[in-house]
Amino acid sequence: MKALVIGCGSIGSRHVKILQNLGVEVYVVSRRETKFQQSYSSISLALKDNLFDYIIIASKTNEHHSDLLELLSLGYSNSILIEKPLFHKPCNISLDNTENIHVGYNLRFNPVFQKLKSIISGQKILSVNA
């Protein structure tokens, strides 16, 4: 199994270590020099040379949207995990063909959020005010 981690900060490096411990062949995209042998300076170069089973976007939050759009424009259609927060500002993005795109948000298991989900499940949400 092959995975690509985009971004090699603390969270990206943590993903790399966990995946390596699971026996996954891991590649990284980073603009900085990294200690990882299988490293690329751009998403397009990484995708040109490899077919990945899944990709983790762990870059700076303000780059998540452009990284996702680049992956989609290059035709990548396998699983993508995007670290939270999803984007740094509201963005228009088509919801077509997004069943393989996931957000790393572990609070979804919090009992408060589980209760909220059960309350609004099946309801049509018209707006959210926070």
What are these regions (language model features)?
Residues Q38-L95:
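Beta-loop-alpha module in the N-terminal Rossmann-like domain of NAD(P)-dependent dehydrogenases
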Residues N62, L86-A130:
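A contiguous active-site-proximal alpha/beta segment in oxidoreductase catalytic domains
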Residues M1, V24, Q37, N78, ...:
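A structural micro-motif
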Residues S13, K17, H65-L69, Q114:
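Alpha-helical elements of the RecA-like P-loop NTPase motor core of helicases
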Residues G7, I56-S59, G104-Y105:
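Small/polar loops that bind or transfer phosphate-bearing groups
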Residues M1-Q37, Y54:
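N-terminal Rossmann-like dinucleotide-binding module
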